[in-house]
Amino acid sequence: MALGGWRWARKALAAGRPLFQGRALLLTNTLGCGVLMAAGDGARQVWEVRARPGQRFSARRSASMFAVGCSMGPFLHFWYLWLDRLLPASGLRSLPSVMKKVLVDQTVASPILGVWYFLGLGSLEGQTLEESCQELRAKFWDFYKADWCVWPAAQLVNFLFIPSHFRVTYINGLTLGWDTYLSYLKYWVPEPLQTPGCAD
């Protein structure tokens, strides 16, 4: 039985190999970003529906997340190609260059993706540009602080050990939890502050 399972896994890997080569890699990266962003939102919505009686699952919200995720896929695909050309490095011997890559990724790509996320979803949900910018100003630093807590270590592993054509797939594999957090942050509405001492 175990031998049959191993053969099946090898066949599945061989069948999937073309998805990570040539033009198919761009499509794989694009759809992977969209699917996982929608899945993260779906996980968050399931929690919200259970926690808040009366709230319903919004397929439109998850579709918007899918669209924004797909729009980020090509950026990430070409970003990692460019970054690998700018700072070619992999393995422990090139740790100083890898650290530079992590720093460039955190200081350039992360803020761009944060802005993209909030403005893109705002646009798809009918917000005006001013409303989206207000939301971005209110939530960006929470996003960026969390980003610094999660992604430098993940990117260190990515740039040290993951082959370049699997970089976006690796990140996509880690993003389910991150995308669930992003969905929480996007749809979180702060409770109104109570004035202390004057309760009726």
Swiss-Prot record:
UniProt KW Coiled coil keyword: no
Membrane topology per record: Multi-pass membrane protein
TM stretches of this protein: 24-40, 63-83, 102-122
Keyword Mitochondrion carried by entry: yes
GO molecular function: mitochondrial large ribosomal subunit binding
Entry keywords, A to Z: Membrane, Mitochondrion, Mitochondrion inner membrane, Transmembrane, Transmembrane helix
Subcellular localization, as worded in the UniProt entry: Membrane; Mitochondrion inner membrane
GO biological process: mitochondrial ribosome assembly; positive regulation of mitochondrial translation
Pfam assignment, any one: Mpv17_PMP22
Source domain of life: Eukaryota
Cellular component, GO annotation: mitochondrial inner membrane; mitochondrion
InterPro entries the UniProt entry points to: Mpv17_PMP22 (IPR007248)
Membership in a protein family: Belongs to the peroxisomal membrane protein PXMP2/4 family.
Function recorded in the entry: Required for the assembly and stability of the mitochondrial ribosome. Is a positive regulator of mitochondrial protein synthesis.
Subunit structure: Interacts with the large mitochondrial ribosomal subunit.
Name under which the protein is recorded: Mpv17-like protein 2
Organism of provenance: Mus musculus (Mouse)
Gene that produces this protein: Mpv17l2
